[in-house]
Structures are given as structure tokens and as C-alpha cells.
Amino acid sequence: MICFKEFSALSPVELELVFAWRNDERIRKHFINESVGYDEHFAFAKSLKDDENKRYFLVFDDEKPIGVINFVSISKDECEFGIYQNPNLRGFGRILLSNLAHYAFRNLRVKRLVARALKDNTKAIRLFLGFGFTLTS
């Protein structure tokens, strides 16, 4: 069973896991931002508790952490999302994206999802296109 846990509710061990994933070269190379510092990461997670425009989740398949999804710039019409899977696992991209879309349309009640991907992130682009997303500039 897939479940989400908000970053602001993560244990220190879970936050350290997300920190390690976020700074893993296999993940980080697809981010616009550089690596994140330890204190900055923990402060960011704490700040999300009071931020209505952002939602970040650690996603579990049963009790196994499989990835991270997030929503930013949330409005009544749309939001931008981000997604990455545990760099030590394979095959969870579709599961993460499917659950992300379900949450966005059902809980956030947005009408449109927007994602950004670097041009060389072909896996993400193929995944998004497979779900019916369209490319823009």
C-alpha cells in the first residue's frame, strides 16, 4: 500500500534518508539547484509546516521508502510538481507519478499539473509523456 508522509512530520532518520537521496549524484544531476546543506535541509523541512504553497512527501510502499514527491506554487488551477525515487531502487517512477497525480487532483483539487525537467533527463521526460503530459519550451 502506498502512503505519503509530510516532510514536516518526518523523523530525524527519515530526514537524513531524504537528505542523502537529494544529494546523491544520481538524483542531484537532474536538479537545477546545487547540493543542499544538512542544516538547510532540516530547516527547510521544518518550514513546510506553515507553508500553504508547498507540500513535500516521502512516499512509502508498505513500509519501504520509495521516493519523494512535491507540489509547489499551488493555486486553485494548477501546481508544479517534482518527483524522484530512491536512487537504490528501480521501477517505481510510474507508481510515484500515478499517486502524485491522484493526490493533486483529489486533494489539492488542481485542474492542471506542471513539471520542469532538464533536457538531458530523458527518463523523466519519457515518464511524463507516457502519462499524457505535453512538452513546452
Where is each model-derived feature located?
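Alpha-helix boundary/capping residues
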Residues: 21-25, 34, 48, 131
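Acyl-donor (CoA/ACP) binding surface of acyl/acetyltransferases
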Residues: 1-17, 21, 56-137
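Short secondary-structure capping micro-motifs at structural edges
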Residues: 45-46, 70
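Conserved GNAT-fold acetyl-CoA-binding loop/helix
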Residues: 26-44
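Secondary-structure transition/hinge residues
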Residues: 26, 49, 105-108
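Short loop/turn motifs at secondary-structure junctions and domain boundaries
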Residues: 47-53
